Structures are given as structure tokens and as C-alpha cells.
UniProtKB/Swiss-Prot annotation:
Stretches that traverse the bilayer: 33-53, 77-98, 113-133, 178-198, 226-246, 288-308, 320-340, 347-367
Major site of localization recorded for this protein: mitochondrion
Quaternary organization: The cytochrome bc1 complex contains 11 subunits: 3 respiratory subunits (MT-CYB, CYC1 and UQCRFS1), 2 core proteins (UQCRC1 and UQCRC2) and 6 low-molecular weight proteins (UQCRH/QCR6, UQCRB/QCR7, UQCRQ/QCR8, UQCR10/QCR9, UQCR11/QCR10 and a cleavage product of UQCRFS1). This cytochrome bc1 complex then forms a dimer.
Subcellular location: Mitochondrion inner membrane
PROSITE patterns, sorted: CYTB_CTER (PS51003), CYTB_NTER (PS51002)
Gene Ontology cellular component list: mitochondrial inner membrane; respiratory chain complex III
Binding sites annotated in the UniProt record for heme b b566: 97, 196
Additional note from the record: Heme 1 (or BL or b562) is low-potential and absorbs at about 562 nm, and heme 2 (or BH or b566) is high-potential and absorbs at about 566 nm.
Keyword Metal-binding: yes
Protein name per the record: Cytochrome b
Length: 379
């Protein structure tokens, strides 16, 4: 008799995705981040669901409802901080996952890559709207500043901003709709993840060498299931260290002050995972130019596959590209630091240099390095 997992219509899908899936024998720990992102999404949906049971999306009660969750709900503080720091873990895994894709040339799977970019935008939108919900000072002013960027769009800008706000400023209507979108988006993300995996399983996984591995496959279970579980344990350990020892390490103290439209905080800044993009936005003196640079800082990922000039897929055997890649990583860390600094000398100049370097590496230097490496191969 054939095993039920191979015949049952539903179990068959699970079997082909998680059990009998042929996987390359040499994929490293950098391939763990996909499953870690799945774990993060599940943690966020579960903790978010329990938070939504106690949260009220009204300007008069939003802040106090979050306080109530932390003080009066059984383990409410734990759920709240798991959700807040879970978002940070989510973005750490996201950036590692994207970095892995760039380093090992995984972007040549165009459909998977493009769905991934849409996923990145969706997660960023969800995180932004979630940050507004506690209705602290940084929530309110962050929402005001970021939504206001849309007013830079010619002709329809102002109308568009007021349409999103549901009024003439960030108020009740804005908070209610942000809560609605923040609730629905993770489920849309989960659906997109399924499409992401569908396209991935059309081609199979890439591997560190970038060379087709059809001749050397191993079953996903038990080899990579056990490897993923190790990753899960490490992620949960790191998350628990954050939540139980310093839950506010990555947050902003200003958000413990209730939102006040009459009092602007001295430094308005987003959560740490948006700081690199915020630094790029601020480094351009023109409003529309800044907004375009902000969008392009993420959308540039869609151009990367078309700038792939190398005869090799992976960077494993491409030393010049490797150096450029790690300079890019250092540059992103620099931008993250600058995004959190006040707008004054020397931070303005450092931010502008780092922004130019970011676009130069991706658009000019990496393709050039690939062409040089192709030449070296011929010698």
C-alpha cells in the first residue's frame, strides 16, 4: 500500500514541499533564512491576533489599551514585546535572506525574486502601520512624516495624502484604517509566501557554488528539517534574550509618551530597520528627489538580475565582487547609523557619500567587476 502522504491530495502538497523535496546537498546555513522568515511570520500572526483581542483602534484609548495589555492582561507584556521584537527579528532575517540572494546569484530565478521584492514591500508597509498603532509620540509623528512624503507626487500629491489620512491630519480615521490594514496584510503576505514557494519549487533551490546540482540531490527530510529546527532554536533564543532582558533596546523612548499633535519630538526617526532608507531619503535636499531615491533604494533589487554580467552565477569564486558586496554591507550599516543621527554636520555629508556609494556599487561597480572577472577567466 502506498504511503498516505503520497496519495492524499493535501498531504501530497506538503510531501512535495517539505518531505520528499529534492534539495542540493551543499546548501549552507544561509539557506535557513527562508524557513526562519516563515517562523517569524507565524509568531507575528499569533502574537498579533492575541494583541488585537485587547487593543482598541481609537485615538482616545489606543495608548491606554496598550498600557492595559502590558499591565493587566495575563502575559500581555510578553505577547506585546514578542510582537515588537519579533518584527526586528523578521527584518534581520529578511535582510540576510536578500543578501544571500544577491551574493549567490539567486536573483536569476526571476519570478521567485520578483515575488520576494513584493513581499519585502508588503512587510515594510505592515511594519510601518504597526508602529503607528500604540499611538505614542513617535507613532504619530512617524505616520505624519512618512505619509506626507506622498505629497511630493506632482498634481495629485496633496489630495492623495488627505485621502490616506481620511481628513486634514493624522487622526482617528487614520489610526482605524491603519489597524485594519495591519491586520489583513500578514494574511496577504502568507498567500504571497505560498506563491514565492510555488515558483521556487519550479526550479529547485540554488546552492553556494551556483552550479546546477541536479546530479546530487538529497531529500529535504530529515537533512534540512533538522537543520531548520536548529535555526528555529537559535532564532527563538535570540528573540527571548531580547524580550526578557532588554525589550526596549530597539524601541524609541518617545513612544512611551502619548501622541500629542502640538508637541514635535526633537528627532523624528523610524524603527532601526528603516533607518538606511530614511538616511537615503534625507541625503537629498529636494522632496520629490528624496522620495524617488527612497523608493529606488528598495526597487533597485528588481534591476539587479538585468545587471548580472558575470559568466558565473554565484560570487563564491569572484573575489572582486565579494569585496564590493561586503563594502555594500558596510555601507548599509553606515546608512543605518546615519539615519538615527540628527541632521547636522558631519552626518549630512557622510549620509550623502554613503547614499551615492550604495547606488554606485549596485548600478556601476558590480557589473564592471563582473566584466573584469570574465576577462581574468580568459587569461
Amino acid at each position: 500500500m502506498t504511503n498516505i502522504r503520497k496519495t492524499h491530495p493535501l498531504l501530497k502538497i506538503v510531501n512535495h514541499s517539505l518531505i520528499d523535496l529534492p534539495a542540493p546537498s551543499n546548501i549552507s546555513a544561509w539557506w535557513n533564512f527562508g524557513s526562519l522568515l516563515g517562523l517569524c511570520l507565524m509568531i507575528q500572526i499569533l502574537t498579533g491576533l492575541f494583541l488585537a483581542m485587547h487593543y482598541t483602534s481609537d485615538t482616545a484609548t489606543a495608548f491606554s489599551s496598550v498600557t492595559h495589555i502590558c499591565r493587566d492582561v495575563n502575559y500581555g507584556w510578553l505577547i506585546r514585546y514578542l510582537h515588537a521584537n519579533g518584527a526586528s527579528m523578521f527584518f534581520i532575517c529578511l535582510y540576510m535572506h536578500v543578501g544571500r540572494g544577491i551574493y549567490y546569484g539567486s536573483y536569476t530565478y526571476l519570478e521567485t525574486w520578483n515575488i520576494g521584492i513584493i513581499l519585502l514591500f508588503a512587510v515594510m508597509a505592515t511594519a510601518f502601520m504597526g508602529y503607528v498603532l500604540p499611538w505614542g509620540q513617535m507613532s504619530f509623528w512617524g505616520a505624519t512624516v512618512i505619509t506626507n512624503l506622498l505629497s511630493a507626487i506632482p498634481y495629485i500629491g496633496t489630495t492623495l495624502v488627505e485621502w490616506i489620512w481620511g481628513g486634514f491630519s493624522v487622526d482617528k480615521a487614520t489610526l482605524t484604517r491603519f489597524f485594519a490594514f495591519h491586520f489583513i496584510l500578514p494574511f496577504i503576505i502568507a498567500a504571497l509566501v505560498m506563491i514565492h514557494l510555488l515558483f521556487l519549487h519550479e526550479t529547485g533551490s540554488n546552492n553556494p557554488s551556483g552550479i546546477p546540482s541536479d546530479s546530487d540531490k538529497i531529500p529535504f527530510h530529515p537533512y534540512y528539517t533538522i537543520k531548520d529546527v536548529l535555526g528555529f532554536l537559535m532564532l527563538i533564543l535570540l528573540l527571548m534574550l531580547l524580550v526578557l532582558f532588554s525589550p526596549d533596546l530597539l524601541g524609541d523612548p518617545d513612544n512611551y509618551t502619548p501622541a500629542n499633535p502640538l508637541n514635535t519630538p526633537p528627532h523624528i526617526k523610524p524603527e532601526w530597520y528603516f533607518l538606511f532608507a530614511y538616511a537615503i531619503l534625507r541625503s537629498i535636499p529636494n522632496k520629490l528627489g528624496g522620495v524617488l531615491a527612497l523608493v529606488m533604494s528598495i526597487l533597485i533589487l528588481a534591476i539587479i538580475p538585468f545587471l548580472h554580467m558575470s559568466k558565473q552565477r554565484s560570487m563564491m569564486f569572484r573575489p572582486i565582487s565579494q569585496v564590493l558586496f561586503w563594502i555594500l554591507v558596510a555601507d548599509l550599516l553606515t546608512l543605518t547609523w546615519i539615519g538615527g543621527q540628527p541632521v547636522e554636520h558631519p552626518f549630512i555629508t557622510i549620509g550623502q557619500v554613503a547614499s551615492i556609494l550604495y547606488f554606485s556599487i549596485i548600478l556601476i561597480l558590480m557589473p564592471l567587476a563582473s566584466l573584469i572577472e570574465n576577462k581574468i577567466l580568459k587569461w
